[in-house]
C-alpha cells in the first residue's frame, strides 16, 4: 500500500460513466479497459456506483455547469454518493455560454474558474 494519504477529492466535469449505453459508452470501454474487460475481476470497478468503490472514497467535491456535456454524469454520481451516504459537495453552475465542459480547466482566467479553485481549496481545508 502507498503511504500517500488522500484526504479529499476534487472532481471537475467527471467522465464517471464510461460504460453506459450512450455516445461515450458505445466506443470508449474497449479503448480504456481492453476488449474483454467484462471478463476480468476489474470489471465491477468500471461502474462508479459500485458500493465497494463508493465506500472507499475520501470526501468528494464535484463541479459541473448547465452547459457541460457531462453534467448528467456528475449529477448522477452525486446521487450515488448521496445514496451511499458519502461525504460530498456539488457545485452546479447555471446556464452561461462560457461555462462549458471543464471550463475551469480550459478557461482558467474566467472569474468563475477562479471561484471553482477557491471553493475546492475551501472544501479541502475541512479535511
Which positions does each model-derived feature cover?
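Alpha/beta-hydrolase superfamily serine-hydrolase fold, recognizing
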Residues: 1-127
